[in-house]
Amino acid sequence: MSATLDAPSPSKPRIVLGFDFGLRYIGVAVGQEVTHSANPLTTLKAHEGNPDWNQITQLIRQWNPDLLIVGLPLNMDQSEQFLTKAARRFGHRLHGRYGLAVEWVDERLSTVEARERLNIKSSASGRRQGIDQMAAQCILQTWLTEQQTIRH
C-alpha cells in the first residue's frame, strides 16, 4: 500500500515520475495512467544521498509530471532501516522543491527484480547497465498496477 503526501485528484490520466533512491545512484522512470505502463528513464549520480537537483529540475520540466513516486526501502519484516528515513527525506525534499504530490511505494525486492529482468549477476555491472532505472520502473509499475486495481 502506498502512502501519500498531498495527492491530487485522480480525475484525469497522470504522468508520473518514479524514483529508486540510493546514496550513490537514483534511478528514474516515467509512466502514465492511460496504458498503466512505466519505462526506465535515467540514472542520476548522488553523493551520500544528495542528488544533482539541477538534473531533477530538468526532468521535472521535460516531463511535467503530476505526481512523484519514491520507493521506500523496508526490511523483509516491513520494519524501517537507515535508507527508509533517507528515502522519506528525499521525497519530502522533492515535494518542497517542486510542489508536487509524492507517494511512497514499498520497494522490497525491486533491485532483485531489476537484476533478473536485465539478467545481471553483479551490482557493479548492473549499475553500468541501468539497474537503478530498471528498479525505478519496477517501483513505478507497482504503483500503476495498484492504481488500476483500485479503479476497477
Swiss-Prot record:
InterPro entries: RNaseH-like_sf (IPR012337), YqgF (IPR005227), YqgF/RNaseH-like_dom (IPR006641), YqgF/RNaseH-like_dom_sf (IPR037027)
Gene Ontology, cellular component aspect: cytosol
GO terms classed as biological process: rRNA 5'-end processing
Record-linked SUPFAM superfamilies: Ribonuclease H-like
Cell location: Cytoplasm
EC code(s) of this entry: 3.1.-.-
This protein's record includes keyword Nuclease: yes
GO molecular function: nuclease activity
Domain of life: Bacteria
Claim: Membrane is one of the keywords in the record: no
Entry keyword set: Cytoplasm, Hydrolase, Nuclease, Ribosome biogenesis
Function: Could be a nuclease involved in processing of the 5'-end of pre-16S rRNA.
Family per record: Belongs to the YqgF nuclease family.
Protein name: Putative pre-16S rRNA nuclease
The species this protein was found in: Nitrosococcus oceani (strain ATCC 19707 / BCRC 17464 / JCM 30415 / NCIMB 11848 / C-107)
